[in-house]
């Protein structure tokens, strides 16, 4: 539900009435689950690290692909966006007190967490591989499935892959993916014209609604036994290391 809401949050802004209502609903869901599993949403660090990942992913992808960075002002804007969201969506301990005040501090925050030594966990392996497989099953079915795994792991550090004990991707495909993204970023920056259809208009279109409906139907068909919040959350990353 949180991921499904991201686009509208970004388009409307963190203090738009619809966004505040949506964020409050997610916070209530977290609080409800926390009554049964209090450790799942109690750590401020887990939330701030997630916001750091959301902020830095695009810049890190460009760096790994060997593409020039986007203007720093874009990173600052994203950093401010998640800062404002973090005031509304946070751990059960309350609003964050350690949110990095600058992009540079956020980079250091993420690097420090990712440099810690956590032993691989069975749960981490299960969750990581399941997420990669879900992506591959949706976009790269059949013989193309290894390409889906390579597309994800091309931008995941060796340290994190080792920690989560994921099934490694074909190194040749990883190399090809990085080169393809470098070319894409070049085209995006220097060749392709800006889109003439605002993304906000696309999200309101029947075309987008039909696409989302098709995705959800495919997910249910692929996993008819999928359940909601009635199972114990699986711990990964920093949470699993504690």
Predicted regions and their residues:
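Mature, function-bearing regions of proteins
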Residues: 1-242
């Amino acid at each position: 539900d949180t991921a499904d809401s991201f686009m509208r949050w970004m388009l409307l802004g963190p203090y738009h009435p619809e966004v505040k209502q949506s964020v409050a609903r997610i916070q209530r869901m977290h609080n409800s689950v926390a009554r049964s599993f209090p450790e799942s949403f109690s750590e401020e660090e887990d939330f701030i690290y997630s916001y750091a990942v959301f902020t830095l992913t695009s810049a890190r992808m460009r760096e790994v692909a060997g593409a020039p960075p986007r203007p720093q002002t874009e990173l600052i804007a994203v950093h401010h966006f998640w800062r404002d969201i973090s005031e509304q969506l946070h751990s059960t301990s309350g609003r964050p007190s350690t949110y990095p005040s600058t992009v540079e501090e956020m980079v250091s925050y993420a690097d420090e967490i990712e440099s810690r030594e956590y032993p691989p966990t069975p749960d981490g392996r299960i969750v990581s591989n399941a997420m990669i497989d879900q992506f591959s099953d949706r976009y790269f079915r059949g013989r193309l499935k290894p390409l889906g795994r390579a597309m994800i792991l091309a931008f995941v550090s060796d340290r994190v892959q080792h920690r989560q004990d994921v099934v490694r991707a074909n190194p040749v495909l990883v190399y090809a993916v990085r080169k393809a993204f470098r070319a894409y970023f070049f085209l995006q920056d220097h060749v392709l014209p800006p889109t003439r259809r605002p993304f906000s208009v696309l999200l309101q279109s029947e075309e987008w609604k039909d696409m989302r409906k098709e995705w959800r139907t495919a997910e249910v068909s692929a996993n008819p036994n999928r359940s909601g919040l009635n199972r114990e959350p699986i711990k990964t990353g920093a949470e699993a290391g504690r």
